[in-house]
Each structure stands twice: as structure tokens, then as C-alpha cells.
């Protein structure tokens, strides 16, 4: 417990020292008109469960080396223009020493997890959505525009994005498949 308290305290001190702007809950978040009142928006709203994370490289589609064959996660779009997504590799090793990971265990935990929350905009005619992370595991993504093309078919949603793989920096097309939670 003491180590967990130290990490939590260090995290909040770092936020204060870096003067990270607070996200005020009572301030309205700007929502793009493209996000509201469209048939596509109505179809995207709700909670989605992760089915698969694959990569396309050189015409081949392979399971993501970072998230594995059986990833877990959720994606949520709400009617106020907010998105929250978390995905993880279910085979990440547990830490042998409880709350204190070895460097390899910490690396595996970080590279096998992805998550952020923020705003989103839908560009229905062009079949893409843009996520604007406000809180993100990857600090460099905060404030960026993350474009994902989408395909909707019934209760299935496929998001695609060209991105760098966290583990080795190579550019790949990520294909993330979701199913609607009912």
C-alpha cells in the first residue's frame, strides 16, 4: 500500500509542477455540429465491447503484437460529444511483487494497455470520426486529433487508423473491431 500511495502522490505532484490544466466538470465541452443529430451519430452512440485488434501491413492482417489474440476493452460514445476507450492485452503478466513491478513487468503493462477520454467529432459523409484525447495513457496524444475511419454494420463497428506501434515505432494500419453492448 505504501508504494501505491507514493506513486499516487508523485503523480499528483507531477501534475501540479507541470501545471497541467484541470478539466472542469461544470464547463460545457464544445461539440461539433457534425457529432449531433445525424443517423450515423445515433448508430455510434452507446457502449461497444472489443472483439479484436489487428494490424494490416503489406497486405497481411495479423493480430496486434501489443494487444494479443484475445484483447479486452470498451469504447463509449455519448450524446454530449465525449468518447472514452480502454483496451488491453489479457495475457499481460501479473506483477510478482504485488504493487512493485520489475522494469520488464512495467513495460509489458504499459505497452499492453491503451486508453483515453475526451471529445469526438463525426464526419459522416467521409466515414471517419476524430477523437481529441484530454486524458490519455500516451501523453503525446493529449490535444491531438486522432482520425479513425469507420465501418458500421448492424451491431459491429470497425475503426481503422494508421499509427505507430508503441512497442517498436513501425507504422501500421490498426483495425479495431467492436460489438455493441446490449
Please give the residue ranges for each predicted region.
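Bacterial N-terminal signal peptides that target proteins for export
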Residues: 1-11
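Bacterial N-terminal signal peptides
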Residues: 9-21
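Lipid interaction determinants
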Residues: 22-115, 119-182
